[in-house]
Amino acid sequence: MTLPVASCERHASNPLLGSSGTFLPVKGWSFFMATVTYDSASRIYPGSDKPAVDKLDLDIADGEFMVLVGPSGCGKSTSLRMLAGLEEINDGAVRIGDRDVTHLPPKDRDIAMVFQNYALYPHMSVAENMGFALKMQGVSKEQRLQKVREAAQLLGLEEFLDRKPKALSGGQRQRVAMGRAIVREPKVFLMDEPLSNLDAKLRVSTRTQIAALQRRLGITTVYVTHDQTEAMTMGDRVAVLKDGLLQQNDTPLNLYDKPNNVFVAGFIGSPAMNLLDGKVTESGVDVGGYVVPLQPAVRSRLGQDAAATVGIRPEAFRIVSNEENGLPVEVAVVEELGADAYLYGLVGNGDEQKEIIARIDARRPPEKGAKVKLAADTERIHVFSASTGDRLTD
């Protein structure tokens, strides 16, 4: 299951949606279907012993929108550049469709890239920028103009074709950069943090337009971002990387509900999942006096008195009475956001205190400094190995 992008982030200004909110039909475009395969692909930079990308195995289906996400230095942009032919592959292979492109130059890979920097020629009009690559390929002026007009109509840029880039907004410039890629009719779109230069409001509307465009064209797309919200709202699947290693490749919903390890659990979700240290007992995992039920098979595998990490998302908590089984929390602050509120509190004592976040009913928030008990929905509690960080619960 993928998260509904266009339906949940629909904007009246989106030129890719009709008045009913459905995608407008695409005419005049003939994109070739293509899979993308990373086959144990590695990249080691000269002078470094540690791979920037370490044996990446990833299969991307025809027409799929795949997002690579992770913190700075995780290898996501390097992975994209390996596919583009801008980085050498030291081991393994990369294929587009059935063709091994590992050693092909970028111009022979039939891909188109959109960067964080739009790289538009300031002295050229929008139409000239969009058609420049076709001009370099020797495409006739008549054919170029036809493709440019079709792409401009697709992107809502028709009235801007005669303008220079300096007369456009950041979002419009980004659409021009996308139009320049579209007119080439490549097999694969590669996008490297294309929204990083936009303000917060424009990023939301532009990411909706990009996702809607990709679904209309049906072109295989690999998209890189450090923003997990972008990843979750745009991708059919999301590949999470850390230190050059693939941590999990799954649908946005599965990443959220069943993270493979502690890193994915803490990285995906806003606010982040609460990760608490616990100790295995006969009854479950004891977290500061709050006993979390544990599956018998998992408990026997860990053994009595073993350490474990318990993960609980903020929305899984509820405030309970002092007589119930719950986690004692001292309220530090409550952020009221209308229908919901977030409680930021402290658990533990002295130097071992840890911050915890819970989503609560905004109509009955506790006061700062109050002591409350929080309990979690047992079906939404995650348990991870304290030694490896791997997920233990189903």
Give the positions of each predicted feature.
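ABC ATPase nucleotide-binding domain
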Residues: 37, 59, 95, 373-375
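The feature captures the beta-strand-to-loop junction immediately N-terminal to the Walker
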Residues: 69-71
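Helix-to-loop junction immediately C-terminal to a conserved catalytic motif
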Residues: 84
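Conserved coupling/switch loops of ABC nucleotide-binding domains, chiefly the family-specific signature
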Residues: 90-93, 143, 243, 381
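Conserved ABC transporter NBD signature motif
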Residues: 92-100
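ABC ATPase nucleotide-binding domains
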Residues: 106-263
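Non-catalytic connector elements of ABC transporters
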Residues: 271-273, 280-394
